Amino acid sequence: MPTSSTTGHASPAAEAWRLIHQLIASQRGRFLAVATELDLSPAQIMALQMLEPGHPVAMSALATALGCDNSNVTGIIDRLQDRGLVTRRSGDHDRRVKMLDVTPAGAQLRAQLLARLYDTVPAPLARLSPAEQTALRDLLRRALDSPSP
């Protein structure tokens, strides 16, 4: 059954959101192929993307960024730590806070991951002109830089 979002009666913002979601969903196979190639779970990929080498992050902050609870992140980090990709230590000012950092091996794998995910432009975006790609990038940056309501 058609809905307002498929018949053109949705607001421009709702239609844009639906199209962004559709674009992301169209790349799921690519994401899973990279996960398989690098022997990482999708959750490990998301975590590794968010951990920048040399910039330790509190495990609770990573949990918030991933939209899950600390116990889920503990399992994700356990597996990354077992592979020598991240380190975990107590916080300098509060020993209850667990800080995460990327190891040199993790930084190398992270670089491979980012290259495989982002160096090749997906076909739907490659079809846009350079000016359209720039406009889309600028609009998305503006949307993401805006404070949440």
Regions from the PLM with identified roles:
Residues 1-38:
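N-terminal leader segment of winged-helix/HTH proteins
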Residues 1-11, 131-149:
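C-terminal regulatory/oligomerization modules of transcriptional regulators
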Residues 12-15, 43, 105, 132:
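N-terminal positioning helix adjacent to the helix-turn-helix/winged-helix DNA-binding module
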Residues 19, 46-52, 108, 135:
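Pre-recognition alpha-helix immediately N-terminal to the DNA-recognition helix
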Residues 21-24, 49-53, 114, 141:
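Short, locally clustered residues in the helix-turn-helix/winged-helix DNA-binding domain
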Residues 28-29, 78-141:
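Charged, amphipathic alpha-helical coiled-coil/dimerization segments
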Residues 29-69, 83, 99:
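N-terminal helix-turn-helix DNA-binding core of bacterial DNA-binding proteins
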